[in-house]
């Protein structure tokens, strides 16, 4: 004997059903659902000609559009005698397959008002629609009404509820529902179990989902290809590729042949989690088993190989797929074009672009961004701008990445005005620049000596709510210091120290250099000495900067002490360290110390730089040095 619905669903579900069934009469199914369709639907429906709906139903509803379906409903409700509930169900089912669940619910309520009696199949359709809209309480209310009318829920009814629970963040209710179904004589089928497995993965319960596959078999319900596909997909999304591969062996033992979709899922996951060789091995295995790879298989592998710089392997795969008459798609071309651009093989990238155009594959924003980047990298800025304008003409509108790439290219080529113009154009197009946009332009303006506009762009960045990062501040401080704006740089630096911005050694080095260049070597020294208290370790550039500052004030003993500290505690001195000290001692007239430093530098396999050799040559010309110094340097 079948159980009552209150025994099947969880206690929470039962309370909702009873609450909806209190009082006399039938509950209103969905008080607001009519409004979801809009009354315009009904105007269209009832103004349509009735026609012969039977012929339309016989011919099938697979290609029917929503407006036509609503028009057909209007004709059916006006027909006399009324069509059977079976015929109404066919129409409701067709609309449900269009995923127009709100329309189905509204039509169902219209039928009720016209006293067209619903059957079990009608209730199943409506319950499924409520569940697909995550309106579980309304689905349960309708279930209660259905049972009150004497209809017993079928496995289809309960599977719809199960699906609703799974997608409505009520996975514990879903598990309880399946358990109670089994206890009370219902026999969950493969679809039921697969739905629950999918729900468990949605709620990050992977181990329970995998265990349920074994429970299915124990209960005499064999998992099918769809079930295994759901499990493989769930495992791969979590990065559990080993478990996914083990599942392939289980499928083989159960004589269920994995299809290309399952192999693609695992290959894609292996690629994402950096197991490219394992992905290639699985690719070979699927070919051995007679499973033909498709464009998705090749695209995943090519994209992965490109991301690891294995562009020759990627090119070989492209040749293989073309030879096997598998047409590459947009993803395939994008991966290869981007890889060739980054490898500096721009001629090959352009050839691929030409090839995809010949194949009538329309480039997307990613394609254009890669090519614009390539043109900028090769200082072909006019060509980059042409590509930019061409993509606009093709209704592929530039994004922030496109603008950032072009602005960076123009600023690097000292065409800052062009970069600034692009920045203004972004605003006109309604695009808000990101941190990279503003930082790039600020750097370009500083390099161009336009300190005032660089500061204005920084202020605009803050007022636009775009957060500066450590790179922005580093560029701002460096630009201010190099343009003689130390006081302004100190204001920014003080703000950074008081805020929660974590300062790195590059920021401190920039400020030390700015202080030393402005003649405030004592302030630079104080900041340098405070680094250990701040838990920041100076690098070789910091030491060299401080040594240079000390040397500029002829504090050579202090500078030499820093060299000694570097040799003892690290970081080890480099060519710049020695050359700075050698020049300082030469200018001070201390030939012996200079000679000793040159010998030490040469023992470390460093050589004199252009500035040192130039100074020695001038002193030789003036007769202040003999040729032995030049011989020592070279």
From Swiss-Prot:
PPR repeat residue numbers: 49-83, 84-118, 119-153, 154-188, 189-223, 224-258, 259-293, 294-328, 329-363, 364-398, 399-433, 434-468, 469-503, 504-538, 539-573, 574-608
MF GO annotations: adenylate cyclase activity
Keyword Cell inner membrane assigned: no
Organism domain of life: Eukaryota
Keyword annotations of the record: Repeat
Any coiled-coil regions, as ranges: none
Gene3D superfamilies xrefs: Tetratricopeptide repeat domain
Short name of one Pfam family: PPR_2
Family, per entry: Belongs to the PPR family. P subfamily.
NCBIfam families documented for this protein: PPR
Protein name in UniProt: Pentatricopeptide repeat-containing protein At1g62590
């Amino acid at each position: 004997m079948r159980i009552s619905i209150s025994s099947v669903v969880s206690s929470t579900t039962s309370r909702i059903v009873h609450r909806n069934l209190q009082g006399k009469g039938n509950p209103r199914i969905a008080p607001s659902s009519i409004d979801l369709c809009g009354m315009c639907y009904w105007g269209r429906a009832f103004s349509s000609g009735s026609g012969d709906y039977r012929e339309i139903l016989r011919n099938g509803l697979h290609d029917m559009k929503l407006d036509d379906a609503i028009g057909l409903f209007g004709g059916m409700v006006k027909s006399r005698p009324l069509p059977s509930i079976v015929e109404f169900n066919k129409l409701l089912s067709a609309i449900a397959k269009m995923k127009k669940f709100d329309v189905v619910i509204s039509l169902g309520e219209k039928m009720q008002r016209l006293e067209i009696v619903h059957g079990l199949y009608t209730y199943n359709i409506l319950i499924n629609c409520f569940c697909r809209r995550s309106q579980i309480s309304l689905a349960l209310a309708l279930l209660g009404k259905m049972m009150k009318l004497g209809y017993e829920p079928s496995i289809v009814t309960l599977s719809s509820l199960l699906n609703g629970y799974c997608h409505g963040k009520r996975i514990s209710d879903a598990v309880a529902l399946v358990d109670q179904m089994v206890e009370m004589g219902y026999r969950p089928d493969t679809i039921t179990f697969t739905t629950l497995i999918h729900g468990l993965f949605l709620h990050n319960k992977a181990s329970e989902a995998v265990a349920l596959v074994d429970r299915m078999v124990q209960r005499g319900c064999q998992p099918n290809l769809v079930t295994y596909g759901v499990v493989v997909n769930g495992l791969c999304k979590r990065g559990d590729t080993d478990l996914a591969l083990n599942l392939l062996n289980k499928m083989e033992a159960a004589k269920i042949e994995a299809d290309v979709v399952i192999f693609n899922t695992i290959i894609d996951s292996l690629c994402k989690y950096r197991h490219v060789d394992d992905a290639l091995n699985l690719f070979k295995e699927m070919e051995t088993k007679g499973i033909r790879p498709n464009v998705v298989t090749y695209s995943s592998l090519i994209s992965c190989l490109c991301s690891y710089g294995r562009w020759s392997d990627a090119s070989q795969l492209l040749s293989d797929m073309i030879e096997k008459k598998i047409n590459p798609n947009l993803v395939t071309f994008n991966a290869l074009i981007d890889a060739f651009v980054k490898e500096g093989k721009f001629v090959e990238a352009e050839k691929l672009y030409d090839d995809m155009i010949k194949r009538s594959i329309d480039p997307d924003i990613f394609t254009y961004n890669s090519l614009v980047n390539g043109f900028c990298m090769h200082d072909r800025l006019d060509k980059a701008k042409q590509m930019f304008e061409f993509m606009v003409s093709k209704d592929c509108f530039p994004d922030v990445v496109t603008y950032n790439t072009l602005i960076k290219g123009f600023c690097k080529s000292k065409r800052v005005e062009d970069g600034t113009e692009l920045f203004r154009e972004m605003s006109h197009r309604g695009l808000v620049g990101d941190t990279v946009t503003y930082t790039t332009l600020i750097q370009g303006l500083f390099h161009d000596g336009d300190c005032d506009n660089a500061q204005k762009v920084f202020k605009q960045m803050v007022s636009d709510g775009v957060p500066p990062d450590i790179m922005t501040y580093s560029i701002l401080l460096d630009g201010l210091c190099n343009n003689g704006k130390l006081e302004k740089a100190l204001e920014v630096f003080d703000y950074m120290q008081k805020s929660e911005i974590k300062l790195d050694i590059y920021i401190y080095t920039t400020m030390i250099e700015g202080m030393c260049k402005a003649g405030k070597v004592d302030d630079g020294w104080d900041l340098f000495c405070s680094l250990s208290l701040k838990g920041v370790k100076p690098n070789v550039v910091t030491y060299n900067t401080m040594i240079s500052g000390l040397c500029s004030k002829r504090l050579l003993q202090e500078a030499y002490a820093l060299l000694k500290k570097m040799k003892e505690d690290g970081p080890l001195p480099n060519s710049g360290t020695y050359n700075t000290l050698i020049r300082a001692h030469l200018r001070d007239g201390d030939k012996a110390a200079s000679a000793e430093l040159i010998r030490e530098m040469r023992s470390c396999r460093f050589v004199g730089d252009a500035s040192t050799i130039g100074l020695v040559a001038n002193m030789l010309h003036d007769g202040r040095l003999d040729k032995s110094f030049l011989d020592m340097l070279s």
